[in-house]
């Protein structure tokens, strides 16, 4: 039986999204129990109204909620009984294999880092997410917004934890291909930090394939793509906006005249398949990667379907036990990175 902790009060709409999303998820997974944190009276009423299977839900009453615009340090210091903090505590205490929250990203990252700590050798956790491609291939992208300013060592650490996670989840595919997001594929391009990261990864034991431009990510050119949080977040929001724009443009075009409406009827099966593949809700649920525990961040503005998919991500991560398998591999890869860094410093000093 998999047990997940759910911050029921987090997100733009709180219980209106988390409860129906959790109910639908439980109905699809009889092997799951949920610990839902939040105001017990409100939670019980909402769960009963939604027809949730109460025999597989434990309610953990909390008295506080982290605001969506609340400063991370304020949440960490003043909201120790928040639904977010208590959900993460369930993972720390071994009562749940993963925690899911649609709450304030900064507060979630700060709280999770404080409660769970990071994997030894990893300075900062990163927001990581699996993105679709034009095939059935998926690519793990990180960092998507947690760290807007990174050193080359931190970017290299992201590459290590991303590569180790993908390898743990798909060992049959061999060493994951790691790409560094840049403005061009040549090793002379990019900021000083990116160029230094390139050299570190080039001399590491990772399967580093070099720089990758953002327009190649959705074509499955790499299994792991690494960027700082500023670039990664802009990249992610651009992809989400482009998908939304294209979906709307196709819909408007097919509704523009009678001939196009008839054509839409004929193309309906293909259009449904395309809509399903591009539905951003299916890819809701980002991993706070680098922590000693599983925490999944749901988009704060998602609906019940999107929240259900965030729970699906937590379920698959918990069931695969991928994160529990990566610490040894991370330690070995980080040791190789230190060697690469020493060689790089020697080369610079000899100039």
Curated annotation (Swiss-Prot):
It holds the Pfam family FA_synthesis. Pathway: Lipid metabolism; phospholipid metabolism. Its EC number is 2.3.1.274. GO terms for molecular function: phosphate:acyl-[acyl carrier protein] acyltransferase activity. It is found in: Cytoplasm. It comes from the Bacteria. Keywords: Cytoplasm, Lipid biosynthesis, Lipid metabolism, Phospholipid biosynthesis, Phospholipid metabolism, Transferase. GO terms for cellular component: cytoplasm. It catalyses: a fatty acyl-[ACP] + phosphate = an acyl phosphate + holo-[ACP]. Signal peptide: none annotated. The keyword Cytoplasm applies. Belongs to the PlsX family. PANTHER family: FATTY ACID/PHOSPHOLIPID SYNTHESIS PROTEIN PLSX (PTHR30100), PHOSPHATE ACYLTRANSFERASE (PTHR30100:SF1). Homodimer. Probably interacts with PlsY. HAMAP family: PlsX. Catalyzes the reversible formation of acyl-phosphate (acyl-PO(4)) from acyl-[acyl-carrier-protein] (acyl-ACP). This enzyme utilizes acyl-ACP as fatty acyl donor, but not acyl-CoA. This is Phosphate acyltransferase. It comes from Neisseria meningitidis serogroup B (strain ATCC BAA-335 / MC58).
């Amino acid at each position: 039986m998999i047990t997940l902790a759910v911050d029921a009060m987090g997100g733009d709409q709180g219980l209106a999204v988390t409860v129906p999303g959790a109910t639908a998820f439980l109905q699809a997974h009889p092997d799951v129990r949920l610990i839902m944190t939040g105001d017990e009276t409100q939670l019980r009423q909402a769960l009963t109204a939604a027809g949730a299977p109460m025999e597989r839900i434990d309610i953990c009453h909390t008295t506080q909620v982290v605001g969506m615009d609340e400063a991370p340090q304020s949440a960490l210091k003043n909201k120790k009984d928040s639904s977010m903090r208590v959900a993460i505590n369930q993972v720390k205490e071994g009562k749940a294999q993963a925690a899911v929250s649609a709450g304030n990203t900064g507060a979630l990252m700060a709280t999770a880092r404080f409660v769970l700590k990071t994997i030894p050798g990893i300075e900062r956790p990163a927001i990581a997410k699996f993105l679709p491609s034009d095939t059935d291939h998926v690519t793990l992208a990180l960092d998507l917004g947690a760290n807007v300013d990174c050193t080359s060592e931190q970017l290299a650490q992201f590459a290590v934890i991303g590569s180790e996670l993908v390898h743990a989840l798909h060992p049959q595919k061999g060493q994951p291909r790691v790409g560094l997001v840049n403005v061009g594929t040549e090793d002379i391009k990019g900021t000083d930090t990116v160029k230094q990261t390139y050299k570190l990864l080039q001399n590491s034991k990772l399967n580093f394939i070099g720089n990758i431009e953002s327009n190649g990510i959705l074509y499955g050119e790499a299994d792991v793509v690494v960027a700082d949080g500023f670039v990664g977040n802009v990249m992610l929001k651009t992809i989400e906006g482009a998908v939304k724009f294209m979906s709307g443009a196709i819909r408007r075009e097919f509704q523009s005249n009678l001939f196009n409406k008839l054509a839409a009827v004929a193309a309906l099966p293909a259009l449904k398949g395309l809509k399903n593949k591009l539905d951003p809700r299916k890819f809701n649920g980002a991993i706070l990667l680098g922590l000693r525990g599983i925490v999944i961040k749901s988009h704060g503005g998602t609906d019940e379907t999107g929240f259900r998919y965030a729970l699906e991500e937590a379920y698959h991560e918990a069931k695969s036990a991928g994160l529990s398998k990566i610490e040894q591999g991370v330690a070995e890869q980080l040791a190789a990175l230190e060697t690469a860094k020493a060689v790089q410093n020697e080369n610079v000093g000899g100039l």
